């Protein structure tokens, strides 16, 4: 760390009135492009309009202008999020049974949507308990609201209005910071300042504010709710905040004020900042005193982290220096040059952020069931399944997006002359070794993982169960996973002697938490069946990575097409007269990667859904006997392909197929409709552009005959557009089919 003289004076980092506000300009479609602004000659125009409207790189080469547009668009995005959130809270206030659910969360199901009987669809309003008719929701908002300390629908109303105010503020900020006071490029590139503010402000103060809310509002209200106090009798949030004695009745250390803090007797506060582990037996959620403690600790960490980087004060770390100092004995120039990449290519920056956020989202999916953070979440099986599925899909899309933007960076922003012998250059130079090894791994995993299933199917068909890979014949136990489970189950006694349980009940030990006769969580046993399907996970993930990484590493050039960078990010083939060069563009790799991402995530959510129904979820008798939803059939049924088809897909589809005439009938229609959308995609994916152009020309001829020819000439979709439409419908159809299948099933049996 070097000490240097501080900056002489504060620099002016904004430009006043750079772009005038003009509704006339915005009203003109395609105003951002000279070609598009001329208006449509052919139907291709509308496709290009949508493809390029947000491709700011194509509007201008000026990095400052691009940065401002991205910055402004972020405010627009935040406005949309606030409007969406406001809508969720408004539905909770206006159309929900939240107050009824709060009074009896084990018997009443959450609902915040009531269907209007316009053409007789009032059948969809099922009885969710407590005399309320509506659609059962599975978003987890009720559980989140209870954890936040919301006790009435009036509070939801006011929060909804607050959301709209914030949305308006964001829309104003987006306009203001583009048209009135736009930051200069140097401001966007000032990474140290940005790190300090984002770490200390967003994450540090954000966590501190949430911890404060949890301690002063959530904890006392939830403690009273857990004790069975009527929500209407509970003091309002501001009373707890303003009246310390109220809090001290529930948490005695409050009467001591800040004295223990300044005298370093922090353990005095252990009545509301705990380290218990496990779940609250009343609600089946994490102890809220544990989560308050967690957020306070996170706040401290990030407040420190937000003071680490060198700005005007000449003290602290410099990002450029850190990166350039990173040199290993075998890595050449190391990270040299990466600072310049990340401050001049927003695609490179975005690629890293998407990869990190996508991975994090998938980690969140797993924590939501292993450590259910909100009260009564763990026993709401439909919500648990929905949250897991949702976070897995989102994580998959973000990771594919990371590869997409990494490839765009390679094509548009990478300058080989400035990157010599640093890590990026070295990776690119041995890309053939990387991709061929990865390919070998994929072949190995594919044949071996699938081969184990095929072996089992064959032995099963031949009536030789003793020769199958299973827990009762030839065992393939996941010994490493079991070891990890075991060490974590035993860890608290060694590392955290005051903790009453391990971080998650899933690790093992004898603990089982049940709420209202339903299992919240118990130790999850892993066996041969899990070993088999985990290798399918490994296979699908590696193939997805192979496709995406090949797209990035060969985005600029390959042995087949050395000048690929000149062809751009997306192109159908390497021109006429050169056969066998289609589907080589970076865009095509993203397109192909999406299908394997869909494969990978589908297997994960199928595994989760069946495993939880078989080995975790179920009811518990007064004698303590657990009856699982599918009676523990996962271990013996999921070890064959036939078992997956018969005992999972077919057996569990009975609810969605038989949903007609019930309140779940919408899922039956969705199941049907989404299958259609999925099949519709194949029409785009399995036919070439020429076929359609030929058809269109014959239809246009007929129109000419009748003198009703359009002024705008109809054109078939380009090859790339056809693929985009195809993959969009494939994914939409596939995901909506899964959604209907999962929800009809779990709402019926959960």
Curated annotation (Swiss-Prot):
The keyword Transport applies. It is a multi-pass membrane protein. Keywords: 4Fe-4S, Chlorophyll, Chloroplast, Chromophore, Electron transport, Iron, Iron-sulfur, Magnesium, Membrane, Metal-binding, Oxidoreductase, Photosynthesis, Photosystem I, Plastid, Thylakoid, Transmembrane, Transmembrane helix, Transport. Pfam families: PsaA_PsaB (PF00223). P700 is a chlorophyll a/chlorophyll a' dimer, A0 is one or more chlorophyll a, A1 is one or both phylloquinones and FX is a shared 4Fe-4S iron-sulfur center. InterPro entries: PSI_PsaA (IPR006243), PSI_PsaA/B (IPR001280), PSI_PsaA/B_CS (IPR020586), PSI_PsaA/B_sf (IPR036408). Its EC number is 1.97.1.12. GO terms for biological process: photosynthesis. Gene3D superfamilies: Photosystem I PsaA/PsaB. Phylloquinone binds at residue 692. The chain crosses the membrane at residues 70-93, 156-179, 195-219, 291-309, 346-369, 385-411, 433-455, 531-549, 589-610, 664-686, 724-744. Chlorophyll a binds at residues 683, 691. SUPFAM superfamilies: Photosystem I subunits PsaA/PsaB. It catalyses: reduced [plastocyanin] + hnu + oxidized [2Fe-2S]-[ferredoxin] = oxidized [plastocyanin] + reduced [2Fe-2S]-[ferredoxin]. Chlorophyll a' binds at residue 675. [4Fe-4S] cluster binds at residues 573, 582. It is found in: Plastid, Chloroplast thylakoid membrane. The PsaA/B heterodimer binds the P700 chlorophyll special pair and subsequent electron acceptors. PSI consists of a core antenna complex that captures photons, and an electron transfer chain that converts photonic excitation into a charge separation. The eukaryotic PSI reaction center is composed of at least 11 subunits. Belongs to the PsaA/PsaB family. PsaA and PsaB bind P700, the primary electron donor of photosystem I (PSI), as well as the electron acceptors A0, A1 and FX. PSI is a plastocyanin-ferredoxin oxidoreductase, converting photonic excitation into a charge separation, which transfers an electron from the donor P700 chlorophyll pair to the spectroscopically characterized acceptors A0, A1, FX, FA and FB in turn. Oxidized P700 is reduced on the lumenal side of the thylakoid membrane by plastocyanin. HAMAP family: PSI_PsaA. This is Photosystem I P700 chlorophyll a apoprotein A1. The gene is psaA.
């Amino acid at each position: 760390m070097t000490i240097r003289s501080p900056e002489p004076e504060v620099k002016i980092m904004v430009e006043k009135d750079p772009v005038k506000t003009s509704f006339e300009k915005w009203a003109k479609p395609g105003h951002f492009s000279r070609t598009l602004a001329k208006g449509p000659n052919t139907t291709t125009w509308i496709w290009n309009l949508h493809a390029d409207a947000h491709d700011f790189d194509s509007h201008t080469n000026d990095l400052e202008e691009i940065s401002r547009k991205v910055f402004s668009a972020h405010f627009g995005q935040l406005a949309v999020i606030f409007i969406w959130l406001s809508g969720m809270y408004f539905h909770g206030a206006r159309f929900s049974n939240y107050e009824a659910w709060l009074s009896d969360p084990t018997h009443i199901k959450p609902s915040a949507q009531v269907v209007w009987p316009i053409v007789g669809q009032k059948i969809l309003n099922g009885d969710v308990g407590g005399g309320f008719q509506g659609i059962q929701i599975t978003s987890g908002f009720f559980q989140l609201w209870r954890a936040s300390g919301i006790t009435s629908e009036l509070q939801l109303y006011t929060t909804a209005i607050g959301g709209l105010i914030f949305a308006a503020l964001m829309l104003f900020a987006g306009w203001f910071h583009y048209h009135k006071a736009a930051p200069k490029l140097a401001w966007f590139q000032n990474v140290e300042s940005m790190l300090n503010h984002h770490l200390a402000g967003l994450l540090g103060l954000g966590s501190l504010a949430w911890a404060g809310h949890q301690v002063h509002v959530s904890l006392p209200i939830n403690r009273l709710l857990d004790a069975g106090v009527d929500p209407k009798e509970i003091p309002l949030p501001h009373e707890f905040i303003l009246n310390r004695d109220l809090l001290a009745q529930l948490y005695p250390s409050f009467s001591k004020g800040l004295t223990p803090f300044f005298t370093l007797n922090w353990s005095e506060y252990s009545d509301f900042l705990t380290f218990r582990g496990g779940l609250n037996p009343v609600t089946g959620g994490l102890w809220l005193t544990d989560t308050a403690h967690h957020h306070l600790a996170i706040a401290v960490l990030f407040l420190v982290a937000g003071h680490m980087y060198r700005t005007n004060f000449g003290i602290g770390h410099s990002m450029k220096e850190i990166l350039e100092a990173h040199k290993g004995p075998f890595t050449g120039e190391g990270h040299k040059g990466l600072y310049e990449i990340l401050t001049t290519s927003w695609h490179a920056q975005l690629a890293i952020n998407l990869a990190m956020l996508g991975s994090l989202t998938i980690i969140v999916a797993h924590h939501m069931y292993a450590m259910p953070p909100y009260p009564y979440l763990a026993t709401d099986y439909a919500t648990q399944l929905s949250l897991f599925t949702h976070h897995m899909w989102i994580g998959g899309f973000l990771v594919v997006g990371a590869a997409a933007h990494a490839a765009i960076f390679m094509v548009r922003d990478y300058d080989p002359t400035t990157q010599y012998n640093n890590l990026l250059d070295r990776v690119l130079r041995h890309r053939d070794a990387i991709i061929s090894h990865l390919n070998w791994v994929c072949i190995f995993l594919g044949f071996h993982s699938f081969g184990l299933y095929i072996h089992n199917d064959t032995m099963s068909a031949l009536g030789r169960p003793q020769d199958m890979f299973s827990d009762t014949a030839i065992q393939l136990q996941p010994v490493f996973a079991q070891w990890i489970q075991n060490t974590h189950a035993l860890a608290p006694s060694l590392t955290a002697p005051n903790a009453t349980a391990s971080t998650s009940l899933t690790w093992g030990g004898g603990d089982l938490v049940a709420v209202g006769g339903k299992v919240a969580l118990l130790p999850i046993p892993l066996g041969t069946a899990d070993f088999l399907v985990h290798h399918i996970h490994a296979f699908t993930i590696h193939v997805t990575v192979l496709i995406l990484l090949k797209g990035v590493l060969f985005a600029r050039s390959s042995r087949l097409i050395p000048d690929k960078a000149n062809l751009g990010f997306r192109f159908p083939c390497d021109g006429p007269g050169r056969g066998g060069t289609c589907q080589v563009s970076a865009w095509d790799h993203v397109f192909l990667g999406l299908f394997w991402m869909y494969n990978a995530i589908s297997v994960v959510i199928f595994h989760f859904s069946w495993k939880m129904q078989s080995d975790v979820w179920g009811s518990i008798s007064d004698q303590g006997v657990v009856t699982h939803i599918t009676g523990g059939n996962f271990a013996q049924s999921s070890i064959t392909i036939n078992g997956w088809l018969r005992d999972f897909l077919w057996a569990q589809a009975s609810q969605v197929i038989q949903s007609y005439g019930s309140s779940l009938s919408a899922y039956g229609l969705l199941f049907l409709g989404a299958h259609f959308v999925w099949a519709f995609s194949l029409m785009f994916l399995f036919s070439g552009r020429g076929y359609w152009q030929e058809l269109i020309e014959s239809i246009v001829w007929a129109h000419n005959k009748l003198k009703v020819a359009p002024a705008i000439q109809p054109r078939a979709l380009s090859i790339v557009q056809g693929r985009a439409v195809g993959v969009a419908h494939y994914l939409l159809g596939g995901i909506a089919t899964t959604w209907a299948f999962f929800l009809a099933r779990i709402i019926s049996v959960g």
